[in-house]
Amino acid sequence: MKLIDSGLSGYEDMLDRQLEIFERIKEGSGDDTLIVTRHRPVITLGKSARIDDLLFPLDIIEEKGVSVRKVGRGGGTTYHGPGQLVLYPICDLRNFDKDLRTFIRNLEKVMKKTANCFDLSTKILDE
């Protein structure tokens, strides 16, 4: 698996990079990749989120330097910002577990074990 440490990045730039890697993997010319990054302040709204879910008015949030973006992923509202490590695995699941849910659960277990090595407490939802 290829590892990319992109440092601090903008959300849109990182999304574009993920899509490029995904297309190469889909075409058979790319490697499974893990991107490690930290984002500039951004709140992403997944498919089930609404702008009304925000705790403060949009103009106040943006005034504080936080971008708000509607994104194509599932789920609700998520904040990303400096100091928060974000990992994006981009993989051909045929090389791993074919069941997406099993693949995600395995990633969660690895992250939990890693965090525990640093004496960080974790909780996996639905565990």
Residue ranges with predicted function:
Residues 1-126:
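N-terminal lobe of the biotin/lipoate ligase/transferase fold
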